[in-house]
C-alpha cells in the first residue's frame, strides 16, 4: 500500500510540476525576446546565459553523487544531452516551416560540437582512472571561459543605446503633445456625452476617450521585463526540480536500473523545460532562442555538470556508466544540430530527429543495462 501511495503521490507531483513548467516557459520566452531587443543584442546570447543554464541538472547530479550513484548522474547527463537536441530542438522545428539562424547561433553550435567531443574524449581517456579529477578541472575552466565570452558579448551589445528605447519615449512625448493640441481628455469626452445628446457626437467622444487611454498606456520599463524574465526562469527551475525528483522516484518504484532511470525517465523529466521553450520558440518564430535553449543547455551539461561529475564521481561507477552506443549518439546529436544551424532548419528534419530519439530510448530499455546494478 505504501508503494502505491508513493507512486500516486509522485505522479501527482509530476503533473503539478508540468503546469508550473508551462507558466515559466511562457514567461521566459516572451520577456527574453523583449529584453534582447531592448539590449540591442541577439536573443541567442541572452538565452545562452539564462535558459541555457541547466541548474536543475546540476542539482540532480549533485544529489546523485551524494547518494553514491555516479552511474545515474552520468546517465542523466548523456541522456539529457541527447534529449535536448533530438527531442527538444526537434519540437521547435516542427512548428516552423523554415528556420534561418543568426551568426551567434552558428558560433555557439560549433562550440557545442567541440566541447562535446572534448567531454567524450576525456570520459574515455580517464575511464576508471584516479586522475579523472584533472579532466573535471579542465571542463570547469571551459565553463568559466564560456560564461565570460557570452557576458562580454552582451556587455558590448549594451554599449550602444537601443533605438527602440528612444522611439518609445519619443512616441510618448508625441502622444502627450497630440493630446494637448487636440484640447481634449478622457474626462472631457465623458462630459461631452452628458451635455450633448447627439448620437454622432456621443460616438465620436467615446472613440476619442478610448484613443486617449491607448495613448496614455506607457510601455513597461526594462526593470519590469527583467523581473518577469527572472520570474519565468525561477518557475522553470523549481518545476524542473519537482519533475526530476518525482520521475526518479517513479523509476525506482518500477524497479528500473540506475542508468536506465538516468538516460530515460530522469533525462526526459529534466529536459521538459527545454521542450516547452523550444515549442514556444518555434511557434513564435524565434529560432535564436531555440538554439540558445538547446546549445546553451548542452554546453552547461558537458562543462560545469561534467566537471562536477569528474571531480566528485566514483571512477569505478563511471567506468560502467556508459556504452560506446550512448557516446556515439551523444556526439552525433551535436553534429546534427551544428549541420542544421549551418544549412537552415526544415520541418521534416524535426520529424527525423524525433524518430531517432524514440529509437534511442527503445535501444536503451531493451538493453536492460543492469550491469551497473550487479
Description of each model-found segment:
Residues 1-374:
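Hydrophobic alpha-helical segments, chiefly the membrane-spanning helices
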Amino acid at each position: 500500500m505504501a508503494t502505491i501511495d508513493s507512486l500516486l503521490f509522485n505522479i501527482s507531483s509530476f503533473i503539478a510540476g508540468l503546469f508550473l513548467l508551462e507558466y515559466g516557459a511562457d514567461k521566459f520566452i516572451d520577456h527574453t525576446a523583449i529584453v534582447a531587443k531592448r539590449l540591442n543584442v541577439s536573443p541567442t546570447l541572452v538565452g545562452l546565459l539564462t535558459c541555457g543554464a541547466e541548474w536543475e541538472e546540476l542539482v540532480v547530479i549533485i544529489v546523485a553523487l551524494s547518494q553514491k550513484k555516479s552511474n545515474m548522474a552520468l546517465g542523466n547527463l548523456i541522456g539529457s544531452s541527447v534529449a535536448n537536441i533530438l527531442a527538444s530542438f526537434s519540437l521547435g522545428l516542427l512548428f516552423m516551416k523554415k528556420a534561418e539562424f543568426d551568426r551567434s547561433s552558428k558560433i555557439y553550435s560549433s562550440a557545442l560540437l567541440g566541447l562535446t567531443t572534448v567531454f567524450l574524449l576525456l570520459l574515455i581517456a580517464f575511464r576508471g582512472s584516479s586522475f579523472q579529477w584533472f579532466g573535471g578541472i579542465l571542463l570547469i575552466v571551459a565553463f568559466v571561459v564560456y560564461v565570460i565570452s557570452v557576458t562580454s558579448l552582451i556587455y558590448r551589445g549594451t554599449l550602444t543605446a537601443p533605438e527602440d528605447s528612444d522611439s518609445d519615449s519619443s512616441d510618448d512625448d508625441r502622444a502627450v503633445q497630440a493630446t494637448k493640441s487636440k484640447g481634449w481628455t478622457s474626462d472631457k469626452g465623458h462630459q461631452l456625452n452628458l451635455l450633448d445628446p447627439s448620437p454622432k457626437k456621443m460616438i465620436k467622444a467615446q472613440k476619442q476617450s478610448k484613443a486617449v487611454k491607448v495613448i496614455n498606456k506607457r510601455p513597461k520599463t526594462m526593470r519590469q521585463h527583467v523581473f518577469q524574465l527572472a520570474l519565468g526562469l525561477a518557475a522553470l527551475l523549481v518545476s524542473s526540480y519537482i519533475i526530476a525528483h518525482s520521475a526518479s522516484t517513479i523509476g525506482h518504484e518500477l524497479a528500473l536500473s540506475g542508468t536506465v532511470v538516468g538516460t530515460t525517465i530522469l533525462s526526459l523529466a529534466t529536459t521538459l523545460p527545454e521542450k516547452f521553450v523550444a515549442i514556444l520558440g518555434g511557434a513564435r518564430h524565434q529560432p535564436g532562442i531555440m538554439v540558445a535553449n538547446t546549445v546553451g543547455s548542452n554546453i552547461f551539461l558537458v562543462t560545469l555538470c561534467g566537471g562536477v561529475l569528474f571531480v566528485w564521481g566514483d571512477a569505478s561507477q563511471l567506468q560502467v556508466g556508459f556504452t560506446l552506443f550512448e557516446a556515439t549518439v551523444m556526439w552525433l546529436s551535436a553534429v546534427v544540430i551544428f549541420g542544421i544551424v549551418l544549412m537552415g532548419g526544415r520541418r521534416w528534419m524535426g520529424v527525423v530527429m524525433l524518430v531517432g530519439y524514440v529509437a534511442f530510448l527503445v535501444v536503451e530499455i531493451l538493453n536492460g543495462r543492469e550491469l551497473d546494478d550487479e
